[in-house]
Amino acid sequence: MAYLAKEERRETIFKAVLDVVAQKGFGGITARGVAAELGAATGIIHHHFESLTEMKCSALLFAAQQDLAANDVIFTQNPIGPALLQILDWRKIPESTSISRIWISAADEATRSPEFDVVYGKAVNDFHAQLSGYLRKGVTSGELKSAIDPDLVAWKLVAVSASLSDFLASDHIAVTGDQVSQIIQHELQESL
């Protein structure tokens, strides 16, 4: 691994962790596997992280922060309706299959590791808060209308989006990507 500043090295490691997670899940992560993905010695992993759990937690936080930043860009560059559809319909995001696999695995890992569960909960709550904030802003500006609290609408939309995206990760569930888009669009129209 070429010389990089400490934060750049950590970011490179996080990306390698997430690449491995997309293939094997968080349960399949080893220091050796991540080092192999990096083309580096395992010492680089042990130098930056005290434990495998710390590395997993840090990588998930990195992924969540990247997702939130990307969502902010989408909301800045698009009207609220198309922006909501774009962030809730994961198929519209490049590498959506990898993203879906990472989040499916994160939910599973949260059941095995109390430390990871805290980080997973923070990531989901932060996404909900971001979405709720945009919904509230849309309701306040008059762009959106909702009979129920935007916090509740945000939870409903997070649940629908995540569940349907999880289904698309399997080649053996009959729902299609177009059907998922239609359902998400319908939920947006019904809720707002």
Regions found by a protein language model. Name each.
Residues M1-E8, S170:
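N-terminal intrinsically disordered/low-complexity leader segments
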Residues R9-T12, A16, V20-E54, S58:
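Helix-turn-helix
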Residues F49, I93, S105-R112:
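Short helix-capping/turn signature of helix-turn-helix
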Residues E50-E54, F75, P79, T111, ...:
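Residues in soluble alpha-helical coiled-coils and helical-bundle/repeat scaffolds
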Residues S58, A69-R101, P150-L157:
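Hydrophobic alpha-helical connector segments
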Residues L61-D67:
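Short, basic, alpha-helical segments at the C-terminal edge of helix-turn-helix-like DNA-binding modules
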Residues L68, V73, E95-I104, P114-S141, ...:
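Amphipathic alpha-helical packing segments from all-alpha helical-bundle domains
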Residues P82, F116-G121, N125, V139-L188:
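Hydrophobic/aromatic-rich alpha-helical bundle segments in the mid-to-C-terminal region
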